[in-house]
Amino acid sequence: MIERIWSGRSWLYLLLLPFSALYGLISGLRWLSYKTGLRLPWKAPVPVVVVGNLTAGGNGKTPVVIWLVEQLQKKGYRVGVVSRGYGGKAESYPLLVTENVTTAQAGDEPVLIHRRTGAPVAVAPKRVAAVKALLANTSLDIIVTDDGLQHYALQRDFEIAVIDGVRRFGNGWWLPAGPMRELSGRLNRVNTIITNGGTPQPGELSMTLAGELAVNMVSGEKRAVNLIPHAVAMAGIGHPPRFFATLQQLGADLKKEYAFADHQLYTEDQLCHLADTNQNLLMTEKDAVKCFNFAQPNWWYLPVDARLPQEKGEIMLNKICSLLETNNNSK
């Protein structure tokens, strides 16, 4: 239903417009308070890159964060990551993510980023606190923040907006009548726009999410998706149909598809009922990090990687690296 409302295919969004107007007024005044100097953002001693979006729901920003961290690591930079940690609840904040920290504490995305990149990750509702915690515990050259485009309390040096190239901005309204956290004009103030799927508009970088081999969650075996028989798919991400479509493009013969809410916490009993012993359960890597402790031999996950045009991606990286060189020269 929410997809129909946000896409403009249902008139019910009209009933929510007063609340959207209030949301837009509050968010606009908040941005204006920083723009006019009534409130001052905190500036970190190292460059900060924000990877975020304008809409609620999954746009593919976490794969972009992982791609960016890995690219900067290859260039020899020490990268830290901060996140709000949606879906997690820690006893205290800021929380430094380690191998012993669970998704119930930190949220699925911070655990996934740390697992994939090995980069230090800190979680806190206030990202300034997360950045300070990282800098107090390790020497870093740059901070990447997973989400936080609207978190103006943290001064940023480079902004990347990730948008869904198929759904774009729906009906264009602020939450809750539409999907927008900020209106599309906000894109005029970011440094780079990355479009996940669909047809990119002029000035946007196209991105695809590529997955090749599924990984067994117990044995670690890697296997082509089309060679996994009697597959049942599940996804608890911002837009599950995208994952199901990816599996089908890879040749999966899906018997059933189960869509869960983003940041869904799972139990062993809940997932064991999705696929019997003669079937195989296929899930996203974001879901898998929440299920390793009770994974079954017939459970698999599909890692995906962000792929950007090499030349344009390198241009963006060079701009970020120039910030690092400028910061190093000023010390």
UniProtKB/Swiss-Prot annotation:
UniProt binding sites for ATP: T55, A56, G57, G58, N59, G60, K61, T62
Keyword Disulfide bond: no
Molecular function, one GO term: tetraacyldisaccharide 4'-kinase activity
Alphabetized UniProt keyword annotations: ATP-binding, Kinase, Lipid A biosynthesis, Lipid biosynthesis, Lipid metabolism, Nucleotide-binding, Transferase
BP GO annotations: lipid A biosynthetic process; lipopolysaccharide core region biosynthetic process
Function: Transfers the gamma-phosphate of ATP to the 4'-position of a tetraacyldisaccharide 1-phosphate intermediate (termed DS-1-P) to form tetraacyldisaccharide 1,4'-bis-phosphate (lipid IVA).
Keyword Nucleotide-binding: yes
Pathway info: Glycolipid biosynthesis; lipid IV(A) biosynthesis; lipid IV(A) from (3R)-3-hydroxytetradecanoyl-[acyl-carrier-protein] and UDP-N-acetyl-alpha-D-glucosamine: step 6/6
Record-listed E.C. numbers: 2.7.1.130
Reaction(s) catalysed by this chain's protein: a lipid A disaccharide + ATP = a lipid IVA + ADP + H(+)
Lineage: Bacteria, Pseudomonadati, Pseudomonadota, Gammaproteobacteria, Enterobacterales
InterPro entries listed in its UniProt record: LpxK, P-loop_NTPase
Source taxon at top rank: Bacteria
One Pfam match: LpxK
Name of the top EC class for this enzyme: transferase
Name this protein carries in UniProt: Tetraacyldisaccharide 4'-kinase
Family label: Belongs to the LpxK family.
Disulfide bonds: none
A Gene Ontology term for the protein's cellular component: plasma membrane
